[in-house]
């Protein structure tokens, strides 16, 4: 039993890596790697039973339960480690390039371990704000323009990079004017959380982040913030200022860059990017429209539940949640809602909720329902995908099913 060749090469490269961020030492960060057969732990003692010591590393048979994605993980003994799943990595066929790719990925996740051990206002991001992040053509177009100018600035080398950087800041300001405070905070914090992890990864690779203006209109705000944050950090490096401490103090990367290169400088739009943004926004709207139409087209009776005083959102699946209109959300897989003497739980049955915001639910609609049962004054539906429990005297029969109004 020996370390996979790519991991052996990656550990050698990590040991030789230059300083990438003050106080960050991937050479001493515990690294957890699943090779498809067993899990390897390097740079630390696991602090739990079940591991075997082999060739200077620790081995767990199969995939360790703590490791389910490329991410920072915590082992049962409390050890924080950078986790990587080799089967999920598309490693190059060349052994040297495979080792380099794996090393860069481990360094990225190791930076998240560093972040977890380094308290800073730069890290927490209100990720739920991504669920309601504006998806219109103006926001998408400005993102594409900013991506274009960030790429020009990075490619300028020793030439004039500050002018395109200021153009990028102009389009950022245009975009941020369309966002509310929560959306702006989400973006700037994702840039310091995920963007800086990509920054240290690309510094290790002596490369820049992949910036594609044509793809930018289609990218999610979260996915784009990896690239924008890394790009801003690389540009800050060119200023020669000790900017990393300012980031740890909570200052957004773009604000720091503005302080170094000057105020945003207007730049004319690119018609092709404007058209691509409109097409992306139209496709997004069409997708939401199709999802909503499919929801309403479900055969069978419907239940309309309302409560002027509000219902409590107990849980939901953010990966299967769609904002289909102002204050209107389609929960495509799972949601739990509670109200006065009432409960609704779905796991595989879609639900439409309405209210002032995601968590302030005032109306709930379900369609495609089976026949309910009535017992002991309760009106109930119980299936493998759906639980509805309501006071029977509050349920009214309607032409399309039932309605309930709770106090």
Question: Which residue ranges define each predicted feature?
Answer:
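Active-site scaffold of zinc-dependent metalloenzymes
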Residues: 49-100
């Amino acid at each position: 039993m020996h370390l996979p060749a790519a991991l052996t090469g990656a550990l050698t490269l990590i040991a030789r890596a230059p300083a990438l961020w003050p106080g960050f030492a991937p050479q001493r960060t515990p690294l957890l790697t699943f090779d498809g057969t067993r899990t390897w732990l390097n740079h630390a003692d696991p602090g739990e039973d079940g591991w075997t010591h082999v060739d200077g590393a620790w081995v767990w048979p199969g995939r360790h339960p703590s490791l389910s994605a490329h991410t920072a993980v915590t082992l049962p003994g409390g050890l924080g480690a950078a986790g990587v799943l080799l089967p999920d990595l598309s490693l190059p066929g060349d052994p040297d390039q495979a080792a380099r790719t794996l090393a860069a990925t481990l360094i990225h996740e190791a930076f998240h371990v560093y972040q977890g051990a380094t308290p800073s206002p730069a890290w927490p991001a209100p990720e739920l704000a991504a669920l309601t992040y504006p998806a219109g053509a103006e926001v998408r177009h400005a993102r594409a323009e900013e991506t274009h100018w960030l790429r020009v600035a990075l490619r300028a080398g020793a030439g004039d990079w500050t002018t395109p950087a200021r153009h990028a800041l102009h389009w950022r300001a245009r975009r941020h004017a369309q966002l509310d405070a929560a959306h702006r905070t989400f973006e700037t914090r994702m840039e310091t959380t995920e963007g800086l992890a990509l920054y240290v990864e690309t510094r290790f690779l002596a490369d820049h982040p992949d910036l594609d203006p044509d793809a930018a209109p289609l990218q999610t705000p979260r996915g784009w913030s990896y690239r924008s944050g890394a790009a801003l950090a690389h540009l800050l490096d060119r200023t020669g200022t000790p900017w990393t401490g300012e980031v740890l103090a909570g200052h957004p990367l773009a604000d720091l860059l503005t302080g170094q290169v000057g105020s945003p400088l207007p730049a004319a739009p690119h018609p092709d990017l404007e058209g691509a943004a409109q097409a992306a926004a139209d496709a997004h709207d069409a997708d939401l429209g199709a999802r909503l139409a499919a929801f309403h087209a479900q055969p069978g009776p419907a239940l309309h539940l309302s409560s002027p005083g509000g219902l409590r959102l107990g849980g939901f699946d953010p990966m299967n949640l769609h904002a289909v209109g102002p204050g209107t959300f389609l929960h495509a897989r799972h949601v739990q809602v509670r109200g006065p003497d009432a409960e609704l739980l779905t796991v595989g049955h879609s639900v439409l909720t309405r209210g002032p915001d995601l968590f302030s639910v005032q109306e709930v609609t379900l369609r495609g329902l089976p026949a309910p049962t009535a017992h002991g004054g309760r009106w109930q539906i119980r299936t493998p995908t759906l639980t509805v429990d309501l006071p029977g005297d509050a349920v009214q029969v309607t032409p399309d099913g039932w309605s309930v109004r709770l106090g």
